[in-house]
């Protein structure tokens, strides 16, 4: 949880409902404690909380002496507790802080819903403001429709809560929302409180500690859990809100295929410094994501099939449904013959083995179960031969795996994903490896599938048992489920009334399959000749003479296939599909169809669209369901180590047809969207627009937002790993050492190789395990392609050769994959399938060098042409906020990032390249964190041109997207912030004097910061002694090691996350403010105070930076930091350093107050100030206990009881500070 969800500048918020929720949850926790730990221990906890509350209140009122006295008394009492008392006390305070955090998130959602005026960051408010300021509505519509924001979820180790606890927290938030209802009866309210009591008790009785380090697969499952838990519901709500605001202010609805928001992931793809992320893991995670996507879509399709029961449809949908039926007949007849022939052959063999006469059986076997002259089907012949043959034939007619449509059922537990993700060593196409843990191909979701034929009424479905379903499914009989049962309850010959008389359904089906007769007609389903379809389909009789219809069938057909168009192609690419035509504004098309419908007589309409007794949408969606089930089964095969069945690709999605035979799996979102779009426009054509704009539209929006993999996976690796791989190649080929070449030599050789067409790496080249892993990663990337993967990010980019090296390794891998596949699928280097390569600039020196690196890249002939041909003249660059801050301090890093963005914008514009900046921000201010709208709107002008990528890390993912209502607000805030930064970019520094002052501030702050952090010989020892940095390794909060490959114990090799995390624990939070006070004081000494105050008021970049520092300073507590030093630091010189740091903190606070003009910290934001003061009485006791536990643990490092107590205290402080790393 984080404070950044609260708007800076908010004057006042009524916190009474929040305080009521906190009291309710606190009282429930108290009731639980009385039962769990006893009245005596509970009273001791109450006493300690009361002491902490009094000390905090006195401190707020300015009575420092009395507050210090109470704090000292509190510390003495806490440090004398034994562990049997300290652990429940720490747990109680930690749970209270977590519960209050849940209440705060819920209060934010409640506040937005209750206000009469729209949230100033809402779509409605921002659109209205832009129109008022003179923005043309058409320009606004285009900007929103073409906007592309992507949030990339990462698994950086800052989420201390187990996923089990996160789920319970989400459940409590949902119950609080229900508790707010004013229409609850007294009994219902009591029941609601009882539900809350049960959840709180379950929290207390659940172990809050991870007992083993999470794997990358565990982290990936956590990311997928967020999608299922909240984003799946939040995205369509957000799209509806966005479309409604657009319609209100521009007169246009949001295009159906627009994707203003997408999600990416690093979970399972970020291998920078994490040896646990391998090529196998990456392949496994992508299969897991596609399994989850297919499963979620299956649930929606099941519900849609129940809802879309109407029998009116457009010509396009009717054509699609007929093709599905026809191919289902062919498939089913083949199954009948095969089963009957096998059974008859077995009967004849058995009879012969017993010496009996088998002439009739042999004859029947020779006939192969074909239809006989008197109309008896193969099933009838089988019955004459024996019961086994009859049963085999009957199975083929009665089997239907689609089942009865039914309303939405509760979501399956996300643990089903966990079952599928275990193990190592499974087969992957092309010889890659996934895992070996066996998994049934029939998951729990599939076991519950009902069984009714898609063309029948819900009430009259055909039922069968699950074993029969399994037998037919194992036989690959997917096509048999696509059509209604034509033969009634019997599989033999039967006559059914149709629109044109009677037909023997079994006979007609078998004859049609043989090609000897026209294919059968669906009972009671009129059709008409379609000159554009194959002869076999055109033979279907029609109920009336074909002729012109009052509807534009050609236009509707175009609408039904619009999903396959637009930028992005097969994988949905990154671009939106809202450019023009039917893929753009749907408003005109809807109005036109409604006008045509109202202008057509009911008789004409019925003749053209009604199909009595037939359910075309269920037929089409049934086929969609089969393909989704096949997709899910294929992923199960990959995840469990089985070789996937080699089904041919094609069907409805391929070519816009309506059949599909074996119902292959889905590869791209456009394939899945095509039949859904056809159904959508068919409903509008038939007067059912209000139906189309319900669940079906929500599903279409989800398809284009989540695709077939939910979140595309980025790959990330350090630049030196690529250089080492190429060094192994050049050394083996006798070309010298790549690592020893100059930058010019590297660029020259890389360009020459990329311009050529020959393979570079010999197949039999010996290599180390590290080099093999790098090459295997590129091979997996070549297999997975852009349908599954997003960008390839190069961390620690130093030169243009780092980017060119990745391009060469990508091309080499695709050539190898193409050769292994025998040339199938276009695996060559010219197929445009390479991932976009994204350099990441992190340190202060790298940020300064970014301009030269990108200039050299964009002026390289090969790279420039590659960028144009493959990536549409678009370049993405990532900026690192974490390492730059650790390297130079927050203020110097912020200014370097700002200038870097300005230069990158100028370079790309000069080269006619569209730039997307990818911001690698963390949760805390020390790592670039802060409120979303402030962060985006303080970027340099021109750096946000409708595209924006950003990471959300660790605890921030749950805080911003874990609850559906909060996620909805976040999505809207991202959208409007990017829109404002695009259409009303923030102003640059208005005077050159401001730049000069910023340069001075940056220089002084960097020098002050580095003199302490990097140049003081005492600092590293003080850091290790005064914080729990060393002990953080025992907290299993991430799969990645805390340090990079270099083993030396220095600040430079320490990851930015534990660096921030450790300082947050002792409440000094040094990385976020160190150096800033010295810089501001130096500027004010030179007479720049008025300039600083003007910069704060008028320059968004500087103002937001100062506001964030002020918020961090309000969270610091030098008294707590002094306690850590007093108890844990023994060296007098280190203690002097600690005293100097606290003195610098005080000076920084004074300097910030002078610049802002505030009387006290956060006096301009009383809401946030109040929230921080509400937490202090619970955080302070945990800090004091942590100090004592650290002291004891360092004397007895193997004491597991002390370790547990320390980890519980770390969790509790993280909950109270609302951010960790």
From Swiss-Prot:
<dbReference type="GO" id="GO:0008964">
    <property type="term" value="F:phosphoenolpyruvate carboxylase activity"/>
</dbReference>
<dbReference type="InterPro" id="IPR033129">
    <property type="entry name" value="PEPCASE_His_AS"/>
</dbReference>
<dbReference type="Pfam" id="PF00311">
    <property type="entry name" value="PEPcase"/>
</dbReference>
<feature type="region of interest" description="Disordered">
    <location>
        <begin position="443"/>
        <end position="588"/>
    </location>
</feature>
<comment type="function">
    <text>Through the carboxylation of phosphoenolpyruvate (PEP) it forms oxaloacetate, a four-carbon dicarboxylic acid source for the tricarboxylic acid cycle.</text>
</comment>
<feature type="compositionally biased region" description="Low complexity">
    <location>
        <begin position="503"/>
        <end position="513"/>
    </location>
</feature>
<dbReference type="InterPro" id="IPR021135">
    <property type="entry name" value="PEP_COase"/>
</dbReference>
<feature type="compositionally biased region" description="Gly residues">
    <location>
        <begin position="648"/>
        <end position="661"/>
    </location>
</feature>
<keyword id="KW-0670">Pyruvate</keyword>
<dbReference type="GO" id="GO:0006099">
    <property type="term" value="P:tricarboxylic acid cycle"/>
</dbReference>
<comment type="similarity">
    <text>Belongs to the PEPCase type 1 family.</text>
</comment>
<dbReference type="InterPro" id="IPR018129">
    <property type="entry name" value="PEP_COase_Lys_AS"/>
</dbReference>
<dbReference type="InterPro" id="IPR015813">
    <property type="entry name" value="Pyrv/PenolPyrv_kinase-like_dom"/>
</dbReference>
<keyword id="KW-0021">Allosteric enzyme</keyword>
<keyword id="KW-0120">Carbon dioxide fixation</keyword>
<protein>
    <recommendedName>
        <fullName>Phosphoenolpyruvate carboxylase 2</fullName>
        <ecNumber>4.1.1.31</ecNumber>
    </recommendedName>
</protein>
<dbReference type="InterPro" id="IPR022805">
    <property type="entry name" value="PEP_COase_bac/pln-type"/>
</dbReference>
<feature type="compositionally biased region" description="Gly residues">
    <location>
        <begin position="565"/>
        <end position="575"/>
    </location>
</feature>
<keyword id="KW-0460">Magnesium</keyword>
<dbReference type="GO" id="GO:0005737">
    <property type="term" value="C:cytoplasm"/>
</dbReference>
<keyword id="KW-0456">Lyase</keyword>
<feature type="compositionally biased region" description="Low complexity">
    <location>
        <begin position="550"/>
        <end position="564"/>
    </location>
</feature>
<feature type="active site">
    <location>
        <position position="156"/>
    </location>
</feature>
<feature type="active site">
    <location>
        <position position="886"/>
    </location>
</feature>
<dbReference type="GO" id="GO:0015977">
    <property type="term" value="P:carbon fixation"/>
</dbReference>
<keyword id="KW-0963">Cytoplasm</keyword>
<feature type="region of interest" description="Disordered">
    <location>
        <begin position="642"/>
        <end position="661"/>
    </location>
</feature>
């Amino acid at each position: 949880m984080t404070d950044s969800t609260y708007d800076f500048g908010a004057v006042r918020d009524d916190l009474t409902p929040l305080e009521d929720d906190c009291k309710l949850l606190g009282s429930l926790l108290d009731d639980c404690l009385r039962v769990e730990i006893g009245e005596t221990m509970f009273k001791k906890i109450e006493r300690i909380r009361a002491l902490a509350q009094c000390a905090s209140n006195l401190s707020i009122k300015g009575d420092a002496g009395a507050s210090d006295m109470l704090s000292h008394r509190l510390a003495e009492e806490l440090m004398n507790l034994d562990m049997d008392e300290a652990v429940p006390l720490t747990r109680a305070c930690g749970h209270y802080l977590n519960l209050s955090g849940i209440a705060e998130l819920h209060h934010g959602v409640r506040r937005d819903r209750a206000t009469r005026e729209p949230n100033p960051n809402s779509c409605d408010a921002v659109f209205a403001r832009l129109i008022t300021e003179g923005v043309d509505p058409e320009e606004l519509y285009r900007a929103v429709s073409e906007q592309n924001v992507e949030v990339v979820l990462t698994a950086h180790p800052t989420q201390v809560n187990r996923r089990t606890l996160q789920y319970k927290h989400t459940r409590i938030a949902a119950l609080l929302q229900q508790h707010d209802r004013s229409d609850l009866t007294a009994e219902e309210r009591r029941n609601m409180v009882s539900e809350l009591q049960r959840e709180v008790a379950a929290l207390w009785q659940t172990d809050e500690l991870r007992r083993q380090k999470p794997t990358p697969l565990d982290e990936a499952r956590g990311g997928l859990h967020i999608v299922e838990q909240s984003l799946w519901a939040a995205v369509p709500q957000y799209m509806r809100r966005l479309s409604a605001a657009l319609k209100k202010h521009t007169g246009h609805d949001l295009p159906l295929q627009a994707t203003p928001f997408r999600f990416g992931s690093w979970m399972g793809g970020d291998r920078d410094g994490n040896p646990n992320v391998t090529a196998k893991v990456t392949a496994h995670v992508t299969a897991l994501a596609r399994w989850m996507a297919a499963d979620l879509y299956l649930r929606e399709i099941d519900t849609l099939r129940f809802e879309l029961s109407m029998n009116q449809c457009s010509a396009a949908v009717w054509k699609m449904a007929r093709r599905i039926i026809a191919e289902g007949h062919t498939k089913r007849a083949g199954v009948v013959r095969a089963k009957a022939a096998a059974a008859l052959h077995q009967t004849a063999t058995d009879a012969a083995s017993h010496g009996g006469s088998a002439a009739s059986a042999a004859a029947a076997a020779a006939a192969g179960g074909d239809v006989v002259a008197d109309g008896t089907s193969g099933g009838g012949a089988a019955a004459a031969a024996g019961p086994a043959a009859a049963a085999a034939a009957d199975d083929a007619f009665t089997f239907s795996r689609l089942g009865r449509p039914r309303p939405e059922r509760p979501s399956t537990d996300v643990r089903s994903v966990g079952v599928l993700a275990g193990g190592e060593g499974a087969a992957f196409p092309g010889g890659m490896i996934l895992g070996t843990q066996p998994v049934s191909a029939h998951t729990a979701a599939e076991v519950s599938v009902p069984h009714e034929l898609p063309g029948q009424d819900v009430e009259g479905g055909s039922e069968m048992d699950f074993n029969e379903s399994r037998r037919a499914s194992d036989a690959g009989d997917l096509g048999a489920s696509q059509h209604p049962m034509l033969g009634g309850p019997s599989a033999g010959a039967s006559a059914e009334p149709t629109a044109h008389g009677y037909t023997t359904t079994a006979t007609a089906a078998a004859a049609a399959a043989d090609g000897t007769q026209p294919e059968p007609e669906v009972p009671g389903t009129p059709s008409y000749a379609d000159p554009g379809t194959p002869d076999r389909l055109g033979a279907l009789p029609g109920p009336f003479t074909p002729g012109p219809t009052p509807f534009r069938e050609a236009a509707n057909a175009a609408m039904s296939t619009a999903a396959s168009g637009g930028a992005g192609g097969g994988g949905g690419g990154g671009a939106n599909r809202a450019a023009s035509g039917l893929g753009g504004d749907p408003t005109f098309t809807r109005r036109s169809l409604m006008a045509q419908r109202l202008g057509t007589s009911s008789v004409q309409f019925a003749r053209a669209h009604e199909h009595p007794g037939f359910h075309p949408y269920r037929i089409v969606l049934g086929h969609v369901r089969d393909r989704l089930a096949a997709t899910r089964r294929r992923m199960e095969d990959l995840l469990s180590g089985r070789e996937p069945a080699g089904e041919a690709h094609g069907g409805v999605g391929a070519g816009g047809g309506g059949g599909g035979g074996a119902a292959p799996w889905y590869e791209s979102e456009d394939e899945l969207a095509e039949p859904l779009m056809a159904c959508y426009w068919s409903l509008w054509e038939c007067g059912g627009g209000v139906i189309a704009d319900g669940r079906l539209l929500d599903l279409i929006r989800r398809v284009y937002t989540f695709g077939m993999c939910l979140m595309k996976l980025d790959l990330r690796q350090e630049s030196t790993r690529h250089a080492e791989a190429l060094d192994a190649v050049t050394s083996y080929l006798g070309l010298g050492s790549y690592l020893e070449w100059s930058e010019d030599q590297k660029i020259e050789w890389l360009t020459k190789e990329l311009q050529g067409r020959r393979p570079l790496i010999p197949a039999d080249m010996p290599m180390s395990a590290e080099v093999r892993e790098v090459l295997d990663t590129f091979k997996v990337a070549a297999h997975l392609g852009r349908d599954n993967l997003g960008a390839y990010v190069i961390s620690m980019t130093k030169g243009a050769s780092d980017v060119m090296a990745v391009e060469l390794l990508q091309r080499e891998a695709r050539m190898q994959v193409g050769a292994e596949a025998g040339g199938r699928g276009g695996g060559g280097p010219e197929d445009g399938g390479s991932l976009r390569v994204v350099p990441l600039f992190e340190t202060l020196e790298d940020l300064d060098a970014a301009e030269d690196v990108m200039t050299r890249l964009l002026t390289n002939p090969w790279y420039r042409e590659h960028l144009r041909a493959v990536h549409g003249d678009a370049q993405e660059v990532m900026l690192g906020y974490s390492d730059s801050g650790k390297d130079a301090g927050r203020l110097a890093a912020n200014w370097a990032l700002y200038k870097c963005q300005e230069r990158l914008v100028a370079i790309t514009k000069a080269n006619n390249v569209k730039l997307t900046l990818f911001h690698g921000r963390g949760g805390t201010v020390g790592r670039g964190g802060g409120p979303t709208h402030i962060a985006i709107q303080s970027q340099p002008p021109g750096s946000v041109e409708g595209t924006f990528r950003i990471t959300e890390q660790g605890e921030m993912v749950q805080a911003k997207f874990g609850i559906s209502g909060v996620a909805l607000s976040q999505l809207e805030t991202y959208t409007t912030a990017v829109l404002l930064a695009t259409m009303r970019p923030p102003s640059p520094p208005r005077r050159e004097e401001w730049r000069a002052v910023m340069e001075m501030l940056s220089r002084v702050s960097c020098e002050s910061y580095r003199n302490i952090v990097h140049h003081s010989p005492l600092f590293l020892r003080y850091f290790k002694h005064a914080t729990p940095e060393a002990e953080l390794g025992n907290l299993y909060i991430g799969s990645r090691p805390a340090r990079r490959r270099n083993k030396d114990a220095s600040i430079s090799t320490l990851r930015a996350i534990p660096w921030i995390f450790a300082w947050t624990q002792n409440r000094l939070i040094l990385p976020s403010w160190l150096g800033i006070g010295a810089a501001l004081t130096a500027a004010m000494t030179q007479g720049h105070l008025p300039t600083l105050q003007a910069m704060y008021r008028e320059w968004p970049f500087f103002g937001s930076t100062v506001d964030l520092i002020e918020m961090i300073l309000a969270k610091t507590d030098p008294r707590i930091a002094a306690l850590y030093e007093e108890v844990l630091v023994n060296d007098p010189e280190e203690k002097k350093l600690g005293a100097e740091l606290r003195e610098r903190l005080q000076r920084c606070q004074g300097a910030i107050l002078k610049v802002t003009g505030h009387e006290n910290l956060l006096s301009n934001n009383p809401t946030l100030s109040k929230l921080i003061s509400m937490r202090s009485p619970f955080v302070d006791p945990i800090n004091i206990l942590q100090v004592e536990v650290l002291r004891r643990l360092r004397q007895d490092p193997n004491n597991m009881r002390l370790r547990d107590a320390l980890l519980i205290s770390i969790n509790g402080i993280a909950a109270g500070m609302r951010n960790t790393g």
